[in-house]
Amino acid sequence: MIVEALNNPFDAEFNKVSSDKSISHRCAIFSLLSDKVSKISNYLEAEDTMNSLKIIEKLGAKVEFKNGVYLITPPKKIVSPNAILECGNSGTAMRIFMGLLAGCDGFFVLSGDKYLNERPMKRVASPLMQIGAKIDGRDCANKAPLAIRGGELNYFAYNSSVASAQVKTALILAGLCSAGCKFKEPELSRDHSERMLLGMGAQISQSGLEIEVKPLKGAYLKPLILDVPNDPSSCFFYAVAAAIIPGSKIIIKNILLNKTRIEAYKVLEKMGAKITYTKTSSTYEDIGDICVQYSELKSVDVNQNISWLIDEAPALAIAFACANGVSTLKNAKELRVKECDRIAITVAALKKCGIEAVELEDGFSIKGGKPNSATIDSHGDHRIAMSFAILGLKCGMNIEKSEFIATSFPKFSYFLRELGARVED
């Protein structure tokens, strides 16, 4: 992908941008817990989320698309498929399906692309195995392909060492489908699963950082009836664009306003960007509009609520690179085990653009400056590719392996062009 620098500021308003990826995955997976048809509109039609629909079909669900709505009819009982369950590039799908299938009768094999199959899965596999799950795979069940022999699991209480919505969701599902559980995390991670499952009728209670889950015991949850809002993580790229291109402004409508999903916007606000939030509705989640206007950015130190902005870290690095002073991100070691080592790759790419950047063990330090045009290897990481495309609006950029953007945001280039950018895919 080649992105040319913008010659003029932009003033844009986006309505349907990119449906929320986290919620779309969960809509597909959680629909299996009901005995009635779930109706999902505005489902994200990206490679990863469409793979989740294909997986639930292999598990016995019927998926239809009618008049812009996905109708998901769950099976009476999850079936043991005769094919591998392909998760593509999605760690979210693989980890959540692990939790669900560990407590279901049957034999299941989860696999992904060459990047996903090198990512660590032990953080989910280990606690599941401690409560009786039968999981095997490469590197002692740390790497996919993973074979799961599902069955009844024991009640468990688990203290997680990481704040991860994926780990939490996997263990909540394992508890729901077996004997129940208690789960505690070191800090609050994104909470879509609890909100959605509570809305479906699950018995989940929370006290501080601890969640208690009552088992379904053969009962079913209510179906999901949901219009998936815009994804704040995907939309954040355009928020950064507005914040770094002088005179620019963007309004993003129908966007998820969950506090665990807009932390990166709060950081951008602390840096000086003018941002307003307007809530327009609330069903499972608060939904509304976000307006971002350019203002000269100042440096910031970020070391709290990291799990709330972990996906936006590469895009935040672009804002850091365009700010006055030295900005730091810490307590983000999780970035080392994403689609690539996002700390090392982000720092190396910024250096190629003439920006002073330093790797920290758990983050990075970036001195803002005037970036240069460069050729960047995204290492097959969709968020690295999109982040440096945004920097390209300021100085021009050539991004290699940009085809992986389609795993999460197929229309990314379309909306860049809507800002006035010249883009060659």
Swiss-Prot record:
EC numbers on record: 2.5.1.19
BP GO terms, sorted: amino acid biosynthetic process; aromatic amino acid family biosynthetic process; chorismate biosynthetic process
Pfam families for this protein: EPSP_synthase
Residues where phosphoenolpyruvate binds: K21, G91, R119, Q166, R342, R383
Cell compartment(s), UniProt: Cytoplasm
UniProt GO MF annotations: 3-phosphoshikimate 1-carboxyvinyltransferase activity
Active-site positions on this chain: D311
Primary role: Catalyzes the transfer of the enolpyruvyl moiety of phosphoenolpyruvate (PEP) to the 5-hydroxyl of shikimate-3-phosphate (S3P) to produce enolpyruvyl shikimate-3-phosphate and inorganic phosphate.
Subunit structure: Monomer.
Protein known as: 3-phosphoshikimate 1-carboxyvinyltransferase
Gene name as annotated: aroA
